[in-house]
């Protein structure tokens, strides 16, 4: 019997489960070998607004994050199917804790995922850049980057 390809909804559900799994690198298995990730609210140069990357680079990035934080559970999750059968929109909350202090945190996301053959080929990730920078320990860098932007605008 031939293997069936996961639907976009099933792929999104697998991604969310992997986010709180024992090995966050497993999230990378939800992505195609080459993928485009866009983060429209990202603040360059801290985080690029668009990245063309590979599944293995994502795996390394996801695993590296466990040095400072672990995602423990999901809050509210809503998966929206769209008129395009290859696109789903997921809204979710990731709850976790910092590895050194066990202090809790929560991050909310909205992602527009384009999925082909059961793998994410394109992602548009919308999240709060301030909360994200705080969780990854880069809030001072974000403030500096924003200050430079404001200075350039006011010049």
Residue map of PLM features:
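Short, low-complexity N-terminal intrinsically disordered segments enriched in polar/charged residues
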Residues: 1-29, 33, 141-155
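Short N-terminal micro-motifs specific to bacterial/archaeal maturation
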Residues: 2, 18, 49-50, 123
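A beta-strand edge to alpha-helix "cap/lid" segment located at domain peripheries
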Residues: 2-4, 67-155
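A solvent-exposed, acidic/Ser-Thr-rich amphipathic alpha-helical stretch
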Residues: 5, 25, 32-85
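Hydrophobic alpha-helical core bundles mediating ligand binding, dimerization, or RNAP-core interactions
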Residues: 12, 16-19, 31, 39, ...
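Hydrophobic pocket/interface hotspot
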Residues: 15, 27-28, 35, 54, ...
């Amino acid at each position: 019997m031939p293997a069936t390809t996961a639907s976009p909804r099933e792929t999104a559900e697998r991604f969310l489960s992997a986010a709180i799994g024992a090995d966050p690198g497993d999230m990378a298995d939800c992505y195609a070998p080459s993928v485009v990730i866009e983060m429209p609210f990202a603040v360059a140069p801290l985080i690029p607004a668009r990245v063309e990357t590979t599944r293995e680079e994502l795996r390394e990035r996801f695993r590296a994050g466990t040095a400072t934080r672990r995602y423990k559970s999901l809050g509210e999750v809503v998966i929206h199917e769209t008129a395009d059968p290859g696109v789903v929109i997921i809204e979710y909350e990731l709850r976790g804790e910092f590895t050194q202090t066990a202090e809790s945190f929560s991050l909310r996301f909205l992602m527009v995922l384009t999925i082909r053959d059961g793998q994410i080929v394109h992602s548009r990730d919308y999240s709060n850049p301030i909360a994200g920078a705080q969780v990854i320990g880069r809030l001072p860098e974000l403030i500096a980057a924003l200050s430079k932007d404001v200075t350039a605008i006011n010049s």
